[in-house]
Curated annotation (Swiss-Prot):
<feature type="binding site">
    <location>
        <position position="134"/>
    </location>
    <ligand>
        <name>Ni(2+) 1</name>
    </ligand>
</feature>
<dbReference type="GO" id="GO:0005737">
    <property type="term" value="C:cytoplasm"/>
</dbReference>
<dbReference type="GO" id="GO:0016151">
    <property type="term" value="F:nickel cation binding"/>
</dbReference>
<dbReference type="InterPro" id="IPR011059">
    <property type="entry name" value="Metal-dep_hydrolase_composite"/>
</dbReference>
<dbReference type="InterPro" id="IPR032466">
    <property type="entry name" value="Metal_Hydrolase"/>
</dbReference>
<dbReference type="InterPro" id="IPR005848">
    <property type="entry name" value="Urease_asu"/>
</dbReference>
<keyword id="KW-0843">Virulence</keyword>
<feature type="domain" description="Urease">
    <location>
        <begin position="129"/>
        <end position="567"/>
    </location>
</feature>
<feature type="binding site">
    <location>
        <position position="360"/>
    </location>
    <ligand>
        <name>Ni(2+) 1</name>
    </ligand>
</feature>
<protein>
    <recommendedName>
        <fullName>Urease subunit alpha</fullName>
        <ecNumber>3.5.1.5</ecNumber>
    </recommendedName>
</protein>
<dbReference type="InterPro" id="IPR006680">
    <property type="entry name" value="Amidohydro-rel"/>
</dbReference>
<dbReference type="InterPro" id="IPR029754">
    <property type="entry name" value="Urease_Ni-bd"/>
</dbReference>
<feature type="binding site">
    <location>
        <position position="272"/>
    </location>
    <ligand>
        <name>Ni(2+) 2</name>
    </ligand>
</feature>
<feature type="binding site" description="via carbamate group">
    <location>
        <position position="217"/>
    </location>
    <ligand>
        <name>Ni(2+) 1</name>
    </ligand>
</feature>
<comment type="pathway">
    <text>Nitrogen metabolism; urea degradation; CO(2) and NH(3) from urea (urease route): step 1/1.</text>
</comment>
<dbReference type="Pfam" id="PF00449">
    <property type="entry name" value="Urease_alpha"/>
</dbReference>
<keyword id="KW-0963">Cytoplasm</keyword>
Length: 567
C-alpha cells in the first residue's frame, strides 16, 4: 500500500486519528479520536480532485443524494472529537461518516450526486451552532452579532429598548408575545420567547404559554416571591415548559431557603448562579448544589480577571434602572458584586458544577462573546488547576467536551429543544459552524443555518476573487427572502402549536415544539452534572465545595483577545 507522511496527509485532507490541534491561542489541545474515512478513498472538491462525474460523484437523482456535503471535517461535540464527512438533506443532518460514490467506492454511507453542493471542511473544526438562553431582545441587530460569533439560537424575552426589556428577559402578555413572534419571524436565527412568570394566579401564565411562549421567566424586578415561584412552576409542570429564574437579590420576599422551599424539588433553570447578575445576596451560588436546579452563568463575570469587578457597578446601575444619587440603589448594586464568588464561578465551571453559559445580551452581558468567554475560562482553568481528570499531557479532550456542552447540548436539554438543535447528530437542524483552528471560538470561517450559509467573512465585492481586503462578515443567502423561513425555527410550547398560533399569526418560519422540560434534573446535564455541597461564608464570601475552598487568582492576560480584534 502506498503511504504519505502525516504532514502531507493533513495538508491535503486535514488531520486524522491521533493528530492534535491547538484551539486558537489557548493552551487547549484537542486530539482526533476517530476518522470515519477509508484511507485512499477520501473525497475532496476542486480541479483535479475526487468529486467529479463518475468518480466521487454518482449518477443518482436529488432524492437519493445529499443536498450539501461538508468534507473531511473535524467534528467537536459533546459526544466525541472525530473526523468525518457530514451530509445534509432538507436542512437537516442525515449522515456523519464516509461520503462518496457507492458505484466505485467502498464503505460509502453518504451518497454524493449531481444535486450535491460541497463545503470544504479540510482542516476545519466543525461545531454545532451555539444556544444562548439569556437574550434580552433589546434590538434586532443582536441576531447578526450572535450569528457571526457562532450562536444560532436565541432564547429570552423582551420587546425592544424599554425599561422592562433592558432589565428582564420577558415578553409579557398575549399582545406583546404575538407582535414579537411576528417580528422574530424575520430574523435568520432560531428564537424562543419567555413569557412573564411573576404572578401568583395561574391564568395569566397559561395564556402566555398558549400564546406561543417557549417557557417562563421569573425576575426580581417583576417580583420573584415564593408564591409567584410556586404558581409559575405549577403551570410549567402542567404545560411542559421550562422556568428560568433571576431570584430576589434583596431577600425582600424571602431568603434563599424560602426560594428553595417554593421550588420544592422541581426543575428550574437558575440564571447567573454566581450572583453578580442578580439573585439572593450573597448566597444564590448555593443553588449549584441542588440536584433539581440547572445552574447557568452569564458572560460578564467569565472568566475572572483583574477588570471584572470594576466594570460591573456601572453596568448594573444602567441595566436595572437604578439611580446613583439614591443610596439604597447604590447599596443594591454593591451587594451583587463579590470578587470571591466570581472567582469560585470559574472553578465550579471547570468541575462541571455549572452546566450552562449564556450572554445576558446588552443587559450586563455581551451577545457576541458567549463562545469566546467559555473557552477563555477553560484556558484559565487549565493554567490554574492543571490537567482535568481523564485528560493527559497530550490532549484536553475531556475538558473540551465539558466546555462545549455548556453552550450547545445542555441549554437545548434545559429548554426542551435538544431533539432539534444543540449537537452535530443525525436528524437535527443543520446549524453548523466551521472554524479555522487558529481562529477557533473567536471568528468563524462559515456559519451554516438550516443547511444554508447565513453569514461568512467576505472580501471586496468588486474584487476578482472573494478574499481581497477589506474582509467583513456579511449576510448570505440564508438571510434573504423566503430562504430565511426555511432555515430558521421559532420554538414554542405544545399548547401554542395546538392553539394554532403559527397559523393565526401567519408565521413563515419552521416551528419547533418544546418537549420533555419537566422530567430532567441536573443529572441530565452532559459533562456538567456535578452536585457538590456548597457552603458560603456570609462575612468573607468564601465559597466551599464539598469542604474545599474555591479560590483562584484573577487573570491578568487572556487568549482570544486583542490580537484577534486589531482589524
Amino acid at each position: 500500500m502506498k503511504t504519505i507522511s502525516r504532514q502531507a496527509y493533513a495538508d491535503m485532507f486535514g488531520p486524522t486519528t491521533g493528530d492534535r490541534l491547538r484551539l486558537a491561542d489557548t493552551e487547549l489541545f484537542l486530539e482526533i479520536e476517530k476518522d470515519f474515512t477509508t484511507y485512499g478513498e477520501e473525497v475532496k472538491f476542486g480541479g483535479g480532485k475526487v468529486i467529479r462525474d463518475g468518480m466521487g460523484q454518482s449518477q443518482v437523482v436529488s432524492a437519493e443524494c445529499v443536498d450539501v456535503l461538508i468534507t473531511n471535517a473535524i467534528i467537536l461535540d459533546y459526544w466525541g472529537i472525530v473526523k468525518a464527512d457530514i451530509g445534509i438533506k432538507d436542512g437537516r443532518i442525515v449522515g456523519i461518516g464516509k461520503a462518496g460514490n457507492p458505484d466505485v467506492q467502498p464503505n460509502v454511507d453518504i451518497v454524493i450526486g449531481p444535486g450535491t453542493e460541497v463545503v470544504a471542511g479540510e482542516g476545519k473544526i466543525v461545531t454545532a451552532g451555539g444556544i444562548d438562553t439569556h437574550i434580552h431582545f433589546i434590538c434586532p441587530q443582536q441576531a447578526q452579532e450572535g450569528l457571526v460569533s457562532g450562536v444560532t439560537t436565541f432564547i429570552g424575552g423582551g420587546t425592544g429598548p424599554v425599561a422592562g426589556t433592558n432589565a428582564t428577559t420577558v415578553t409579557p402578555g398575549i399582545w406583546n408575545m404575538y407582535r414579537m413572534l411576528e417580528a422574530v419571524d424575520e430574523l435568520p436565527i432560531n428564537v424562543g420567547l419567555f413569557g412573564k412568570g411573576c404572578v401568583s394566579q395561574p391564568e395569566a401564565i397559561r395564556e402566555q404559554i398558549t400564546a406561543g411562549a417557549i417557557g417562563l421567566k421569573i425576575h426580581e424586578d417583576w417580583g420573584a416571591t415564593p408564591m409567584a415561584i410556586h404558581n409559575c412552576l405549577n403551570v410549567a409542570d402542567e404545560m411542559d415548559v421550562q422556568v428560568a429564574i433571576h431570584s430576589d437579590t434583596l431577600n425582600e420576599g424571602g431568603f434563599y431557603e424560602e426560594t428553595v422551599k417554593a421550588i420544592a424539588g422541581r426543575v428550574i433553570h437558575v440564571f447567573h448562579t454566581e450572583g453578580a447578575g442578580g439573585g439572593h445576596a450573597p448566597d444564590v451560588i448555593k443553588s449549584v448544589g441542588e440536584p433539581n436546579i440547572l445552574p447557568a452563568s452569564t458572560n460578564p463575570t467569565m472568566p475572572y480577571t483583574i477588570n471584572t469587578v470594576d466594570e460591573h457597578l456601572d453596568m448594573l446601575m444602567v441595566c436595572h434602572h437604578l439611580d446613583p444619587s439614591i443610596p439604597e440603589d447604590v447599596a443594591f448594586a454593591e451587594s451583587r458584586i463579590r470578587r470571591e464568588t466570581i472567582a469560585a464561578e470559574d472553578i465550579l465551571h471547570d468541575m462541571g458544577a455549572i452546566s450552562v453559559m449564556s450572554s445576558d445580551s446588552q443587559a450586563m452581558g455581551r451577545v457576541g462573546e458567549v463562545i469566546l468567554r467559555t473557552w477563555q475560562c477553560a484556558h484559565k482553568m487549565k493554567l490554574q488547576r492543571g490537567t482535568l481528570a481523564g485528560d493527559s499531557a497530550d490532549n484536553d479532550n475531556n475538558r473540551i467536551k465539558r466546555y462545549i456542552a455548556k453552550y450547545t447540548i445542555n441549554p437545548a436539554l434545559a429548554h426542551g429543544i435538544a431533539h432539534t438543535v444543540g449537537s452535530i447528530e443525525k436528524g437535527k437542524l443543520a446549524d453548523i459552524v466551521l472554524w479555522d483552528p487558529a481562529f477557533f471560538g473567536v471568528k468563524p470561517a462559515l456559519i451554516i443555518k438550516g443547511g444554508m450559509v447565513a453569514y461568512a467573512p467576505m472580501g471586496d465585492i468588486n474584487a476578482a476573487i472573494p478574499t481581497p481586503q477589506p474582509v467583513h462578515y456579511r449576510p448570505m443567502y440564508a438571510c434573504l427572502g423566503k430562504a430565511k423561513y426555511q432555515t430558521s425555527m421559532i420554538f414554542m410550547s405544545k399548547a401554542g402549536i395546538e392553539a394554532g398560533v403559527p397559523e393565526k399569526l401567519g408565521l413563515k418560519s419552521l416551528i419547533g415544539r418544546v418537549e420533555g422540560c419537566r422530567h430532567i434534573t441536573k443529572a441530565s446535564m452532559i459533562h456538567n452534572n456535578y452536585v457538590p455541597h456548597i457552603e458560603l461564608d456570609p462575612q468573607t464570601y468564601i465559597v466551599k465545595a464539598d469542604g474545599v475552598p474555591l479560590v483562584c487568582e484573577p487573570a491578568t492576560e487572556l487568549p482570544m483577545a486583542q490580537r484577534y480584534f486589531l482589524f
